[in-house]
UniProtKB/Swiss-Prot annotation:
Pfam families: Ribosomal_S7
InterPro entries in the cross-refs: Ribosomal_uS7, Ribosomal_uS7_bac/org-type, Ribosomal_uS7_CS, Ribosomal_uS7_dom, Ribosomal_uS7_dom_sf
UniProt organism field: Alkaliphilus oremlandii (strain OhILAs)
Organismal lineage: Bacteria, Bacillati, Bacillota, Clostridia, Peptostreptococcales
The organism's place on the tree of life at top rank: Bacteria
UniProt keyword annotations, A-Z: Ribonucleoprotein, Ribosomal protein, RNA-binding, rRNA-binding, tRNA-binding
PANTHER family on file: RIBOSOMAL PROTEIN S7 (PTHR11205)
A molecular function GO annotation: tRNA binding
Family: Belongs to the universal ribosomal protein uS7 family.
Keyword tRNA-binding attached: yes
Protein name: Small ribosomal subunit protein uS7
GO cellular component term of the entry, any: small ribosomal subunit
RNA-binding found in the keyword field: yes
GO biological process, one term: translation
Amino acid sequence: MPRKGSVPKREVLPDPIYGSKVISKLINGIMLDGKKGVAQKIVYDALALINERTGEDALEVFEKAMNNIMPVLEVKARRVGGANYQVPVEVRSDRRQTLGIRWLVNYTRARGEKGMVEKLAKEIIDASNSTGATVKKKEDTHKMAEANKAFAHYRW
């Protein structure tokens, strides 16, 4: 813990094309080795592909996908009397968004298609339809929290 109070959170600037902070965070999540231009091209091309494939507004499809992959509950390890319990806790809104983007990027990279644009577009479309690996991760997280509901009284 810092001695001089808490460190202020840095505000993420909205992306130049869609004016969305969530898209900006997705770009930052996809970025490797500081190559933001490459990451922007991937995200914008993927959103254009989504627009073309679904016929819907890409930003709406992305927001629907994010709502389907952001977790409400998660488990945290809590040590009580020499035993570790998985205690279910609610996820803060900023962490929900961060986890959703992190899972989306990780499962996009793990997909089998050729090219990151194709992978990202398909993963976002799958997530908006409540299918795909990212949605499964959210459901698994919720199942884990549900299974450990008995330890909810250990919350801190």
